[in-house]
Amino acid sequence: VPGNAVQLAAGTKVEQYLTLGKGEQVVALVPLTDGPPLALGTAQGIVKRVAASELGTKPEIEIIALRDGDRVVGAAPASDAAELVFIADDAQLLRFDASSVRPQGRSAGGMAGIRLSDGAHVIAFAVVGGSAFDAVVVTVAGSTAALAGTDAGSAKVSAFTEFPAKGRATGGVRAQRLLRGEDALTLAWVGSDPRAVGTDGSVRTLPEPGAKRDASGQPLDAVVVAIGTAIR
């Protein structure tokens, strides 16, 4: 997608630039430059880095060989100095050095990123740069039995530094203590200056940052469906 094609004030429908197949969705918007490798994380806990030279200039390319039932949950450029972060729906978070993931070719299937518990899957994958000292982790917990869009659940915002780094392909640490009636994380995000929105695109208020790593969340006033950051 040409960088000057999107009107930030009104937005532009993705369908104007690409055709999404059944069940497909956009998970990331990344620049194609000669910069650091592109890091990918999947729902089954696979991680991969693809060298920028492998991406080429074709309008559509396959950049990872997915296992049956797997899907990409996040992607972002990641230099060797960056850290990669997985968050699973069972409230486990793992962060490790990007340098432990050697860049592979487009057709490769990646390598183990996080060791998941039985039945768990990754809901968020992020890249944190070496200088992102203000990064935070936002987690939202709720009930998987509730109808979509009806359970606001609880949320917390913790400093990224609250979470100890571990090695690739290991288990994570607890990212939020679930309250009664909650059985999973429904949403998670890592970055700086988080902004949350509801189903209609309206702004939602998140708790103040500063929560302990494994603390429980604070009840939300309304459902949060997406978290991002301001475009600067």
Give the predicted meaning of each segment.
Residues 1-232:
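Short, structured "edge-of-domain" segments at secondary-structure transitions
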